[in-house]
């Protein structure tokens, strides 16, 4: 079952895809969005859903460190509702606390990307990979 992992921000959505067996997650792309113009990148997501035969979405929930929800959590949930309405596919949520920090560390320490501008281009994709991979591992443990 192929899933699409999404790291929803205010200006971009990082996108990752699982392999067909749902074991690993790979980065795919970063989609620019503009909430003020009601531009949510759904055309790009439709293209990806069709190309990869996606069967569901995993969105990160950027909770505060104390576990409480803020504006960013609401943004992710609203985005999830848009996806449900548009694609009629299941939407799952995964706690994403510190995934961007972890993604930044991976890019610097493991991939050797020290240029901040270069990291910024792929940080959302890497965060989406971490969200999706964490979800895949958590659901595999439950089964």
UniProtKB/Swiss-Prot annotation:
Record keywords: Cytoplasm, Hydrolase, Nuclease, Ribosome biogenesis
Stored CDD domains: YqgF
One GO cellular component term: cytosol
InterPro entries in the cross-refs: RNaseH-like_sf, YqgF, YqgF/RNaseH-like_dom, YqgF/RNaseH-like_dom_sf
Keyword Repeat applies: no
One record GO biological process: rRNA 5'-end processing
Signal peptide: none
Cell compartments where the protein resides: Cytoplasm
UniProt-recorded Gene Ontology molecular function terms: nuclease activity
EC number assigned by the record: 3.1.-.-
One Pfam family in the UniProt entry: RuvX
Keyword Nuclease: yes
UniProt enzyme class: hydrolase
The protein's role, per its UniProt record: Could be a nuclease involved in processing of the 5'-end of pre-16S rRNA.
HAMAP family the UniProt entry points to: Nuclease_YqgF (MF_00651)
Similarity field: Belongs to the YqgF nuclease family.
PANTHER family reported for this sequence: POLYNUCLEOTIDYL TRANSFERASE, RIBONUCLEASE H-LIKE SUPERFAMILY PROTEIN
Protein's name according to its UniProt entry: Putative pre-16S rRNA nuclease
Species of origin: Lactobacillus johnsonii (strain CNCM I-12250 / La1 / NCC 533)
